[in-house]
């Protein structure tokens, strides 16, 4: 397995920046920033299906082992921009003596995910030696996540607290992405200033803080490391508020509405909620992760957001007594792609002409043959409904947004990662 690697030395300093993975692929990014005594890795992600050559668990272990065997420093750590698998997916392979850092919201989402996986494994697997190994592995992952060092998001117009890894200073800055609690980093070492954007956008509800943050804090930047996910895609990046407006229009035209969306995207769930309220529809959800995520969002963000991120959807499960009321009054049901069988059962007896699926996810999941081969769930969900409308916007920066970020920051050097091979700024 070959892997494109890029390295640059910052002038008049001991700072070395190594892109172990991500210079020619979306996801699976691993960036190393080192000095004579210290090094910090930004993200240790799992490769995304369909975006590069798949790796086996053995190859992942060898990759992590080889990276940590080289350039060993007295002070080492991994910091995560957010909790998507293509950024945190190799966390369980990081050596135990290397501390890992993430925002508290990201930690809570990871704990929710792996706790639910453990519950599913307990219920689905018959007692056996193999089941015991799986549950032990689940427990080890949960313990490792609990051991993460965490930071809290600061209030608006307040400088975030920095932390030190040896002689490297890291300051996390909250941003908008398609998952809750996503961050950029200002990384300072040996007189040099590096701005790592992680994944970001300016068209979400939380995206309004992007440019003011850059104007205020991203000055005298020697190196800007930015994502470039959309550079070859040409994604149409409408505002999240426009997503909600379009949803409200079609929700008003159908009695029964299913919304296929990510459980961890706080801004998309807010769009669904706002649209359903405008359309005067009852709000429901199914799926354990959806419920846990909304409780995290409500607990942490309801008051700060003045109610925008206050979620009180009603839960719907198997043989639920709510079915009768829902069929009578109509509904909006938010769900994930793994719950198709339940949703089909719930829609039995309903007139298909009154049922609409709002597909609110990346269209590549059902259009790209490689994506469909890896996971056909999104395509299958879409094909199960005669009435379907796509209403979505990217969780990533548009080409115009990336250009504006570069223009504001005015870095001495730019490295673009998290992009397809051949994509150019």
Task: Describe every region a protein language model picked out.
Residues 352-358, 366-395:
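Mobile, glycine- and charge-enriched loop segments
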Residues 365-368, 388-425:
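Internal alpha/beta domain cores that form substrate/cofactor-binding pockets in large enzymes
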């Amino acid at each position: 397995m070959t892997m494109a690697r890029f390295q640059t030395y910052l002038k008049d300093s001991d700072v070395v920046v190594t892109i172990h993975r991500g210079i020619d692929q979306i996801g699976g990014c691993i960036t190393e920033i080192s000095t004579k005594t210290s090094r910090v890795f930004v993200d240790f992600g799992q490769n995304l299906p369909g975006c590069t050559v798949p790796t086996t668990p053995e190859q992942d272990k060898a990759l992590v082992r080889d990276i940590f065997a080289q350039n060993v420093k007295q002070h080492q750590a991994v910091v995560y921009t957010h909790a998507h698998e293509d950024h945190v997916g190799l966390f369980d392979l990081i050596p135990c003596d290397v501390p890992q850092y993430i925002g508290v919201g990201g930690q809570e989402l990871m704990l929710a995910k792996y706790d639910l996986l453990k519950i599913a494994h307990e219920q689905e697997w018959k007692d056996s030696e193999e089941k015991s190994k799986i549950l032990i592995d689940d427990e080890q992952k949960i313990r490792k996540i609990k051991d993460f060092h965490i930071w809290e998001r600061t209030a608006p117009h307040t400088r975030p607290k920095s932390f030190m890894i040896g002689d490297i200073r890291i300051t996390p800055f909250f941003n908008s992405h398609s998952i809750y609690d996503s961050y950029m980093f200002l990384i300072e070492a040996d007189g040099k200033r590096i701005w790592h954007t992680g994944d970001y956008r300016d068209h979400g509800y939380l995206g309004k803080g992007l440019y003011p943050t850059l104007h205020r804090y991203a000055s005298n930047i020697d190196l800007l490391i930015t994502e470039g996910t959309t550079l070859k895609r040409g994604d149409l990046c409408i505002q999240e508020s426009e997503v909600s407006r379009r949803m409200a229009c079609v929700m008003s035209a159908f009695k029964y509405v299913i919304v296929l969306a990510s459980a961890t995207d706080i801004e998309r769930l807010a769009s669904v909620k706002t649209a359903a309220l405008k359309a005067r529809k009852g709000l429901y959800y199914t799926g354990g992760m959806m419920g846990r995520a909304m409780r995290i969002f409500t607990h942490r963000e309801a008051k700060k957001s003045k109610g925008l991120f206050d979620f009180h959807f009603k839960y719907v499960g198997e043989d639920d007594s709510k079915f009768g009321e829902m069929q009578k009054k109509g509904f909006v049901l938010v769900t994930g792609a793994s719950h198709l069988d339940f949703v089909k059962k719930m829609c039995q007896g309903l007139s298909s002409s009154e049922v609409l699926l709002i597909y609110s996810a990346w269209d590549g999941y059902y259009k790209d043959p490689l994506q469909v081969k890896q996971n056909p769930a999104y395509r299958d969900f879409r094909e199960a409904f005669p009435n379907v409308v796509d209403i979505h916007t990217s969780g990533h920066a548009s080409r115009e947004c990336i250009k504006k970020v570069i223009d504001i920051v005015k870095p001495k050097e730019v490295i673009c990662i998290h992009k397809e091979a051949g994509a150019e700024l």
